[in-house]
């Protein structure tokens, strides 16, 4: 049935909000636009409105979605437009890899279309656009850290995967993120890197002048170790993100005068030695005899070492630990590398 009418029929009901000036928009406008684009998703954490016309033309709105773990990650949710005409939702050759975790829209007539991947990656405008978007994301996060610290802390658990991945995969973003990335202890207290360093360096500096960052990955399983550290006056970080083994390695490279130790990787007096060890109480023969005694009753199908060592005056008589380096290396190997984390 055909009906004559002089009214236009609206086919696309989603208004291109990115073409409007940020000053003309309210929070509600941004949230409604997000719901129109992604009706089944939870509200985003933050958003960024992009608007630049020199040395390239770019408009857009990018949203930070909630990311709880790698199972909730979805790539390719950024829609690319050219003068409001949809082009693709695969922008991994246009924006840095970690930014493909964001949602939203970017619109630019300066991004070449129908060209090879290698040409796209070498195009000067694409490089400038990529760098600009990374800078705006870092600017937004730093602004929230400076002016809305409480809001950042409240949403940190949903942001940390994104920020850690960005720091691990993009050097420029990493340098910026060192100012606003947060550390968290089991009590739910948050610190910047500088704040935490100042809080622990007096008590947690070892005899070699290295600041020791103690951390736990499971507060229940490692409860007794956490309490043992606290009884010595030490603080413990909670690092339970799936990328944290890689992240810790990155931080140790950035802060060369520090080291990270999981709180259950040794006796607490050995994790932060304050003075040179005294001579062992047992002779080598006595230590070997004690080791053989334990090996005789331990399971045969596990790899382990039995050693007799000085666990300190207040240490437990027997301690089961996992070597920090070997455990961390195994965790990183099992993950298969940072770039494989999100299916690259």
State where each predicted segment sits.
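Conserved GHKL (Bergerat-fold) ATPase module
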Residues: 1-344
